[in-house]
């Protein structure tokens, strides 16, 4: 009887995994689902010879944005129609965002980046050095990438960001290089977005590094969030400034909107249901935020002069009507010098620490990105 049970176990196990036969067609089984504690748009299921990764469509949540089969070995897999096959580990990738290039640096996989778009936004010294040495090729603008250079780079995957109603990715969809659709920015929470590093770590062959880093981020973030809960002040806060004739503000359910709540700041649009940004006229923001205690903004300074409240007022004559400008409680991040965009999407604990330092000065925390704008 025992021998019969053992034989059945071996038969079932061998059948379900398909062995290591070259060219084996893998039947879809239930697999082992990797539990995501925070990410809502990402599902990862481990099968015998591959991981199945499904990305939910952030704008049509009942539909999938993309499905990947990430092979565990060089064995050939026969994938269903509409599924993208990725052979890991990826050794040659092109990133269309400094966000994901910055993460690959954190995962010690920066040497696998062979090209980037929008190099003028790069701040990380490892990336700048690789560009200088010719190890990373300038792929042009993210909106109009240099297709010839991408092909010449022999990239195994392109890390791109999906947008609602964008109409696709243009010519890069036709060159036969898999597109990794990085929808992490649409996660409603900071830790949800950061948890996507598990997917990117899987692709790059850096799973353990990604798991370890996420555990570190989660622990630090939750510690800071708990500290903020114990503070007494709840300052109101407004965010960013005019871009042309429009004021773009993060929605109340956006990553930043939720993070402001985690810092125990009362965001003026906290009740808004948008997870992305909203485009508002100046008059609307003035009505809603004129009495806000704190004004947070991102700006690009001029090398010739420091950015001051006078500089800010020169950009729009109505800024002096805000209480935060009048009392000098404006805090800015100089994106020309700062690594805010390269670091904070996957190190939200760094950002939360800054917010707590501003909202609760009694914490005596030092700032990493945001500093008081002087007159």
Provide a role label for each language-model segment:
Residues 1-25:
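Bacterial Sec-dependent N-terminal signal peptides
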Residues 17-101, 209-238, 326, 339, ...:
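Bacterial Sec-exported substrate-binding components of ABC uptake systems
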Residues 51, 59-63, 69-151, 156-162:
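A short, structured surface patch at a secondary-structure boundary
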Residues 91, 101-105, 148-152, 170, ...:
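Solvent-exposed, polar/charged alpha-helical surfaces in well-ordered, non-transmembrane soluble domains
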Residues 109, 175-176, 263, 326:
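Short, structured coil segments at secondary-structure junctions
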Residues 135, 154-246, 270-271, 329, ...:
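Extracytoplasmic substrate-binding proteins
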Residues 164-174, 299-312:
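A ligand-binding cleft/hinge motif common to bilobed small-molecule-binding domains
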Residues 224-309:
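Flexible, glycine-rich surface segments
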